[in-house]
Regions:
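Hydrophobic transmembrane alpha-helices and immediately adjacent juxtamembrane helices
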Residues: 1-260
Length: 260
């Protein structure tokens, strides 16, 4: 009887979330914009602090990756990129892919890496992952500048490359990539706080995801060579974004509004 009476006793206080799960108070984020800028500056300064080459690593990583992919996938495996130079083809995909992975990897450990700050002072928690996405725009801008430099070089070398008229919408693709990295990274971060195994799987999973995201090959090649596995790429929104990037910047491939 006593147990049933205790269970029936109503709570004096009930703590409930102020907003719904998917509700974002962007007005509050704007009110803390100065703090957001401080986090952005922190992310930029601390990445390569006390390193010899510093920001040059922004250039080294995509260049050597593009060279390696060109040797392995184009020269050895014989993947055809049409009239576009293989190095430029790979560099276009790698530049956009690097921005996504930087946002994903940076936000996937948000709650764990900033637990001390979260417990000391109140501010909108969404500010930290947003600052990571914004700071990675600087890295993307530098790498995209390298792509433009090689684009101009190949153009004056007589390569059959040209911009597509839809290139004006290219910034929207970058915004979409940032949002995807932010959303998926925050979801993984919430899992990592409870299941530590995810922290070991995220790097391996990103590597596997790259190979089904059409970073180093055209999507049409999968349908031609391995049609039974084409669904792995066709149902991957990242593959359509990267394919659309090459369509806009190199005028090669195709664009699928359904995939986007």
């Amino acid at each position: 009887m006593n147990n049933s009476e205790n269970n029936a006793t109503p709570w004096l206080f009930e703590i409930t979330p102020k907003n719904k799960f998917f509700s974002l108070n962007l007005t509050e984020v704007w009110q803390y914009r100065d703090l957001l800028l401080l986090f952005v500056k922190r992310d930029i300064v601390t990445v390569y602090k006390q390193t010899v080459l510093g920001p040059l690593w922004y250039l080294i990583q995509p260049l050597f990756t593009a060279i390696t992919f060109t040797i392995i996938f184009n020269n050895l495996a014989g993947i055809n990129t049409g009239t576009v130079p293989p190095f430029l083809f790979n560099l276009a995909g790698i530049t956009v892919w690097n921005y996504f992975t930087a946002c994903l990897m940076g936000t996937s450990n948000t709650f764990g890496a900033n637990a001390g700050i979260f417990g000391k002072v109140y501010f909108p928690r969404i500010i930290v992952p947003i600052s990571i996405v914004i700071s990675n725009l600087l890295k993307f801008g530098i790498q995209f500048g390298i792509f433009i430099a090689f684009y101009v070089f190949y153009y004056f070398q007589g390569a059959a490359i040209s911009l597509n008229g839809l290139v004006v919408f290219f910034p929207l693709l970058i915004i979409v990539m940032g949002i995807l990295g932010l959303g998926l990274g925050m979801f993984i971060s919430s899992l990592v706080t409870k299941y530590r195994d995810f922290s070991h799987l995220i790097g391996f999973g990103v590597q596997l995801l790259m190979y089904v995201s059409a970073v180093v090959y055209p999507m049409a090649l999968v349908k031609e060579k391995m049609p039974e596995y084409a669904w792995l790429v066709q149902y991957n929104p990242l593959a359509y974004i990267i394919e659309t990037t090459r369509y806009m910047l190199l005028n090669v491939g195709h664009i699928s509004f359904w995939g986007l």
